[in-house]
């Protein structure tokens, strides 16, 4: 646990920079509940204006395709250039990815039925 509490780790939800999290709904290494827990920490720290999350229909860990990766880069560049988030809903992200002619279709989806009712982990970053 000390590893996650070390300075420089951004697991407490107190981000100081814009952050787009991409998460695959079937990620076997980082369950959906952990993303919800991080979102809860972001909100508790009043940092919701700096944070967005995009879910991808995939059962891998960091197996984003080239279209999804390009969408993430473009979304962050737009956020950094303009100071505000553009649309980050699945339909908008999929349309952006399709417009890039990457040779593969982006797979952004709503988190829907994969949402857990509440963050259900005993340990939270910054606590002992």
Predicted regions and their residues:
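C-terminal His-loop and adjacent cap/lid subdomain of alpha/beta-hydrolase
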Residues: 1-128
């Amino acid at each position: 646990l000390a590893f996650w509490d070390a300075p420089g780790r951004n697991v407490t939800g107190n981000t100081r920079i814009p952050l787009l999290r991409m998460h695959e709904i079937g990620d076997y290494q980082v369950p959906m509940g952990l993303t919800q827990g991080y979102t809860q920490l972001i909100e508790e720290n009043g940092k919701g204006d700096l944070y967005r999350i995009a879910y991808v229909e995939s059962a891998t860990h960091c197996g984003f395709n080239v279209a999804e990766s390009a969408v993430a880069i473009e979304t962050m560049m737009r956020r950094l250039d303009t100071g505000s988030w553009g649309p980050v809903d699945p339909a908008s992200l999929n349309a952006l990815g399709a417009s890039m002619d990457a040779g593969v279709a982006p797979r952004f989806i709503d988190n829907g039925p994969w949402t857990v009712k509440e963050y259900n982990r005993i340990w939270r970053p910054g606590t002992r």
